[in-house]
């Protein structure tokens, strides 16, 4: 209830009229951002007949890049990845250019998990937000996190103005 109160009671749909529509996935480590990114890409491709692009923006966990590439192959959705040697900001810049050249309707940016109190990593998210200008910023939350999630959501919202939340592992 507190999370709903924090984000607002109004339900809204993603507006796909702007091309590309940019969705940025944020949250704590292990919350399910990468898997959720793939699920959202599948939904956007099948239900809305859009051409999504997955962006591997987690430069701290090589397995996340591999996982997203595997999901992309399974879903027949392209994945823009540069491994872990470039900054998240540079990867997102490259992805924006790639999407423009390849007519991708929707860009889904999978970011690295981080603690809300880790200021340098939170600043990285703010930088990515500035570059990508996302239409949606979704906080991915492990449903087993407990009451502290209200503080986590408030911190992410203060820094990024999140537009929604996804509860995982229900």
Annotate the PLM regions.
Residues 1-57, 64-84, 92-100, 105-109:
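Primarily NTPase-proximal linker/entry elements flanking Walker-type ATP/GTP-binding cores
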Residues 31-33, 58, 114, 147, ...:
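Gly/Ser/Thr-rich helix-start
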Residues 55-56, 81-82, 111, 139-141, ...:
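Thr-Gly-centered strand-to-loop micro-motif
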Residues 61, 84, 113, 145:
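Short, glycine/acidic-enriched loop or turn micro-motifs at the edges of active sites
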Residues 62-68, 149-152:
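Short, glycine/polar-rich helix-capping loops at beta-to-alpha or helix-loop-helix junctions
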Residues 87-101, 116-170:
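Conserved catalytic-core segment of NTP-binding enzymes
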